[in-house]
């Protein structure tokens, strides 16, 4: 059984690149490549060693099984958002955090277990229409079985 940790997270401002996707395998590496190349253009980055990926599930997800996937970094302000980039505010809240250790191809299985097993039996409900992935110094490579990321 999955057992998340719970954290109180303050509000965050994030800036990054977004793609509208149905989850095809090439979409994620492609948008990460674009984001990494443009990362140096983002001003006011709070911690350049921490990246996020935010997945926004709107009505499109229910109707078309598509969502917006956004690799991003936290910034101190939205004063200067580079062209073709997107800015989003992440609200302060108590979040359930799930750790993934292993290669990135195992991440979809963790999502499936969170939404199909843990959430229905947890007594919790989704507060927002997004989830967030954290990639910090513990994440080394996509194919490293020791890599760590959090959802």
Which residues are covered by each model-predicted region?
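A solvent-exposed interaction/effector surface
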Residues: 1-151
């Amino acid at each position: 059984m999955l057992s998340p940790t719970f954290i109180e997270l303050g509000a965050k401002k994030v800036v990054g690149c977004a793609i509208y996707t149905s989850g095809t395998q090439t979409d994620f590496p492609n948008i990460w490549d674009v984001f990494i190349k443009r990362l140096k253009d983002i001003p006011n980055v709070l911690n350049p060693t921490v990246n996020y990926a935010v997945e926004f599930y709107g009505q499109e997800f229910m109707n078309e099984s598509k969502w917006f996937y956004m690799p991003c970094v936290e910034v101190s302000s939205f004063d200067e958002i580079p062209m073709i980039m997107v800015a989003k505010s992440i609200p302060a809240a108590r979040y359930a955090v799930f750790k993934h250790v292993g290669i990135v191809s195992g991440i979809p299985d963790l999502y499936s277990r969170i939404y199909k097993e843990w959430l229905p039996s947890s007594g919790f409900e989704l507060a927002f229409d997004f989830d967030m992935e954290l990639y910090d110094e513990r994440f080394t490579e996509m194919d490293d079985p020791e890599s760590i990321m959090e959802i």
